[in-house]
Regions:
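S-adenosylmethionine/decaboxylated-SAM
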Residues: 1-142
Length: 142
């Protein structure tokens, strides 16, 4: 399952020297590649997801949406109850200010048990020979 509201239409790297093909219509480009019937796609703001939008509580979540502290906090806070009782959460762009900190606050607020985590932080932004802008991988239990 994927969720997007297409609020970010300017998809490109921060560094100008990094080659990235121009994507004129990210929605059309994504949906063209999203034809496998095993997957569902929900076009709405993540904060307005309901249990009716998903068929089962996901146990593996890859989050690559807003990464400002409050944006990520509000997004995850809105959907954490939709996740399975034990789940893997992968946060993209963990190098960005607020990503790791907002996740720590979500863990506290929802009294989640941190079973395992790995922070893969990089020193060079958008390094195509490394983990781009970092990842934080967590195994959590409600």
């Amino acid at each position: 399952m994927a969720v997007d509201n297409w609020c970010n239409t300017d998809i490109k790297p921060m560094r100008e020297e990094v080659f990235f093909p121009t994507i004129k219509d990210p929605r059309k480009d994504f949906l063209y590649k999203f034809k496998d019937p095993r997957w569902t796609f929900v076009e709405k703001d993540i904060r307005s997801l309901t249990p009716r939008d998903i068929c089962d509580k996901p146990n593996i979540i890859f989050y690559d949406a807003g990464h400002e502290y409050w944006e990520q906090y509000e997004n995850l806070d809105a959907v954490i109850d939709l996740f399975a009782d034990k789940f893997i959460l992968i946060l993209d762009d963990a190098n960005f200010n607020g990503v790791v900190t907002s996740m720590e606050e979500i863990i506290k607020k929802h009294d989640l048990k941190l079973i395992w985590q790995r922070k893969i932080l990089t020193t060079i932004p958008e390094d195509d020979k490394d983990w781009w802008n970092g990842l934080q991988i967590l195994v959590l239990e409600k």
